[in-house]
Amino acid sequence: MFTFEAAKYPTASGVYLMKGEAGTVFYVGKAKNLRSRLRSYFSEHGDNRPQIRFLLKRVHDIETIVTDTEKEALILENTLIKKYRPRYNINLRDDKTYLSLRLDPRQEFPMLQLVRRVRRDGALYFGPYASSTAVRATLQEIYRIFPLRRHPWESCRSRSRPCLYYQIGQCSAPCHGKISAEDYQRLVDGALALLAGRESEVVESLQHQMAAAAERMAFEEAARLRDQLRAIEQTVERQKVVEAGGGDQDVVGLHREGGEVELAILFVREGKVIDRRSYNLEWRLDEEELLSTFLQRFYGRDVCIPDRVLLPFLPEGSEVLAEWLSEQRGKKVQVLAPLRGTRRKLVALAARNAEESFRERGSRREARQGVLEEIARRLHLTRFPHRIECFDISNVQGRFSVGSMAVLSDGEPDKGAYRHFRIRSVEGSDDYASLYEVLRRRLERGLREESLPDFILMDGGKGQLNIVCTVLDELNLTGRIDVAGIAKSRVMANVRGKAVERSEERFFLPGRKNSVNLRQGSPALFMLERLRDEAHRFAITHHRKLRRRSTLGSVLEEIPGVGEKRRKALLKHFGSLKAVQAASLDELRAMPGLPAALAERIHAAFQERKTS
């Protein structure tokens, strides 16, 4: 039993790590005064909420790391959360970075790119966009109005004629000399103005060009400009102005209910709401700490940081947070909690969005709850399947064997918990042995970290089911985790032996001779089939990536003059094998320490591979 002794802990700023019985870090926090913060948890008159009491009962040790400043503590906390992935810290389910649009004005004919990382590289970034659907819709609008090039310059120039987008009027084909640099720059300026929210500038310019075209009787050009104007008007109509001249700001709203907090972020760019994102979080610790940690996690993922972040209240250390955000962005960022005026109304709007999102999530949760109850009933599970894990193995003739784990948390895909496993101990194509290794590694780690699934679904029949049962027996987990195998439907002859029919998906359970079927078309069957397909997709995708890397790597190493040291230098300079392959001859020649002749050989080798 852990006994808290305040005198043991420093009064300086720093980070604290709460550890469980096996030494596993389950919570990481920061504080301006470590002793004061920890005392607030353990004192008699401290926070008595059930979730706090629950958390503190699991503490067996607390480690502290002192820092010189609060900002250092903030940065260290972020680093440790990424390293340990503590169970009770905020987990943003969509742990991928958001999409942004990138345009490098230094290129001769710039193009728009979809990127997930915002770098301080001199390029212009627009976003973030919470969904790929939203950003692709924006791109389509831009290409319709301003037909910028769509493909990398090298691949464009290697074509014998312009691409299909040129034929349908959505690319100006600068790679084949179909537009002058001056006219192309006008398209770029228009696209940038539209993305920055300066539609009036674009409209005024197009109206002037249209009038000039009509005056010189260039009616086709005038009609094209008219269509561009109409497209802009339709786009602008769909965007709501919430603060004229308000610039770029992210607005955070918060809704509390029970032991949960719903946070909504409105992305406001040039006074218009361009997107929204919401997160449902467990309310373990105090609100200030929750909000501060959330902002660190959110903005620590290479997203576009705006001029201002508007909050419902200022958490402790908001000045440090603003300083950190400014450093990340390279420009000053304000963190504000407005008390009145338009900005206060924006925060209230974000709070209403958070509440609405919570209600919608609750309705979906109730529906998923019913589906999970049906799964538990039909598959004779001994516990409610809050967390379901499905495993799959992928290899080609025993090469690049990988395992995958897809996860459902309360019936919803938890993509942040998906895992790949490189098979270490199995030579050749032995799916059963590979599956044994993957399950053993996963469950041993689960025992150490006290994070076991409720239900394991195997992609396969009795053979795969026997493997998981063996692993559970060896780890004394039989009875603590439910298991089943899902076998794909079979093709069977009908009674006349002529036509073929497809049987239902079959579920195999331990200790049962016959399989169990779920009703065709039922939500329960759909949920489990989707999970099985996700595990398969995740394994195949990673397997293809490994094969592609290996192929590219072998091409690189076969080039005379490229050894292990040179290969590492190329990867460090360009960032990836794919980037080396896509590099132009000029970019290769510009790499420090790479002889011009070798740069030409590398470029020629990859060009030959493209055309072969």
From Swiss-Prot:
A single BP term in Gene Ontology: SOS response
Xref: CDD domains: GIY-YIG_UvrC_Cho
Domain (GIY-YIG): residue spans on this chain: 11-90
Any GO CC annotation of this UniProt entry: cytoplasm
Subunit structure, interactors included: Interacts with UvrB in an incision complex.
One function term, GO molecular function aspect: excinuclease ABC activity
PROSITE patterns in the cross-refs: GIY_YIG (PS50164), UVR (PS50151), UVRC (PS50165)
Compartment(s): Cytoplasm
Similarity-based family: Belongs to the UvrC family.
The species this protein was found in: Syntrophotalea carbinolica (strain DSM 2380 / NBRC 103641 / GraBd1)
HAMAP family: UvrC
Transmembrane segments: none
InterPro entries, alphabetized: GIY-YIG_endonuc, GIY-YIG_endonuc_sf, GIY-YIG_UvrC_Cho, Hlx-hairpin-Hlx_DNA-bd_motif, RuvA_2-like, UVR_dom, UVR_dom_sf, UvrABC_protein_C
Protein task: The UvrABC repair system catalyzes the recognition and processing of DNA lesions. UvrC both incises the 5' and 3' sides of the lesion. The N-terminal half is responsible for the 3' incision and the C-terminal half is responsible for the 5' incision.
Name the record gives this protein: UvrABC system protein C
Domain of life according to the entry: Bacteria
Keywords, comma-separated and alphabetical: Cytoplasm, DNA damage, DNA excision, DNA repair, Excision nuclease, SOS response
Annotated UVR domain residues: 200-235
